[in-house]
UniProtKB/Swiss-Prot annotation:
InterPro entries: SMR11/SMR16 (IPR038971)
Purpose: Probable cyclin-dependent protein kinase (CDK) inhibitor that functions as a repressor of mitosis in the endoreduplication cell cycle.
Source species taxonomy: Eukaryota, Viridiplantae, Streptophyta, Embryophyta, Tracheophyta
Residue runs in coiled coils: none
Name the UniProt record assigns to this protein: Cyclin-dependent protein kinase inhibitor SMR16
Keywords: Cell cycle, Protein kinase inhibitor
Domain of life: Eukaryota
Entry's Gene Ontology molecular function annotations: protein kinase inhibitor activity
Length: 125
């Protein structure tokens, strides 16, 4: 990897372009990420996606929240975290209990009761 200061970066591209160019054609220069000089701090080029998140995460000093709003927000955040943790834990190790053995089928009586009239028994059975 080649580390260059920002001012040397422009000179290097021009030099590479002149070395690689043939008369009548443009030369291909491999892209090089410029590095910051010693006096600068930070990164020269940040991804647009990073800028998007940085802009959304900035805290505006003009906007103030009351104590009640802060406590309510804190309560809702903690509540949602606890709720998520409970739903995650409830899925682990929970099994439907095995039911007890089912009772047997009822047994058919083998003997008829002697108190029933025989004519009535013929109609029933």
């Amino acid at each position: 990897m080649v580390l260059l200061s920002f001012s040397r970066y422009c000179d290097t591209i021009t030099m590479d372009y002149e070395e690689n160019s043939i008369e009548g054609t443009s030369g291909y220069v491999e892209p090089i990420t410029p590095m910051i000089s010693k006096g600068d701090s930070g990164i020269i080029a940040i991804s647009p996606l990073c800028d998007h998140y940085n802009n959304h995460m900035r805290i505006d000093s003009l906007t103030t929240c009351s104590d009640e709003e802060i406590i309510e927000s804190l309560y809702q955040n903690i509540f949602s975290i606890v709720l998520c943790l409970q739903t995650e834990e409830s899925g682990y190790g929970s099994h439907t209990p095995v039911s007890a053995a089912c009772p047997g089928a009822p047994m058919k009586l083998t003997k008829l009761s002697r108190n029933i009239d025989p004519g009535f028994q013929r109609k029933l059975f």
